[in-house]
């Protein structure tokens, strides 16, 4: 709605409370973590376990053109409250006590020059997910993006890779059934399956949309 769009354009101080900020970010992101794309609990729930992330970190002395572009802010002070610099993340597996990911792993590391803010990236995804469930950067990202994915955000921790691989396997099984029925897939059938995957990826609350979009692109580039 236009009212919601107006809210999204406001900066952090415009919101009356922390719950309102979380809820607006949750809605903007379709209910999934900005980095790993796990489904997030509704922030209205008492035990939501979400974290408000600053893409350009709050506590850093680094500031340059990449930081301004990534955060949408004019300076470090502005970045701490700028709407485009705010993301909502999962708890980074904090409760597990190890193999942290996302904001929990990133901390105050500045990745503005090495990666891209999900809110500032025009294509539908930052990650390409292979059949093995591992995530790599899509074309167009900086050359250091793999380091960010693997070592800073740690998006290839084994638990994330396993669940993405399981998702891929479930769809591959369905594709194989269609192949057996038709003795192979025509280009139209491949395009139809790709369209269904892309539609599913766009549904609010759909986990791991980049995995579905990667599969769709392999079916029908």
Give the location of each predicted region.
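Short, small-residue-biased leader/transition segments that mark boundaries at the very start
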Residues: 3-8
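Local cysteine-cluster metal-coordination motifs and their immediate loop/turn environment
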Residues: 32-38
């Amino acid at each position: 709605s236009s009212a919601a769009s107006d809210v999204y354009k406001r900066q952090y101080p415009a919101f009356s409370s922390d719950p309102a900020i979380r809820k607006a970010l949750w809605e903007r992101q379709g209910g999934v973590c900005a980095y790993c794309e796990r489904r997030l609990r509704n922030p209205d729930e008492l035990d939501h376990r979400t974290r408000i992330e600053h893409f350009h970190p709050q506590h850093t002395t680094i500031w340059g053109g990449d930081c301004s572009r990534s955060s949408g802010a004019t300076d470090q002070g502005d970045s701490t409250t700028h709407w485009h610099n705010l993301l909502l993340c999962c708890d980074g597996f904090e409760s597990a006590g190890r193999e942290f990911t996302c904001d929990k792993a990133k901390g105050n590391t500045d990745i503005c020059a090495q990666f891209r803010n999900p809110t500032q990236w025009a294509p539908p995804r930052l990650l390409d997910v292979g059949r093995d469930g591992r995530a790599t950067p899509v074309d167009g990202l900086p050359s250091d993006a793999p380091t960010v994915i693997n070592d800073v955000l740690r998006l290839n921790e084994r638990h994330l890779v396993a669940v993405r691989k399981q998702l891929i396997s479930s769809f591959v099984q369905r594709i194989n059934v269609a192949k057996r029925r038709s003795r192979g897939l025509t280009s139209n059938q491949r395009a139809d399956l790709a369209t269904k995957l892309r539609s599913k990826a766009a549904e609010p609350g759909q986990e791991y949309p980049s995995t579905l979009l990667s599969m769709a692109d392999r079916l029908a580039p």
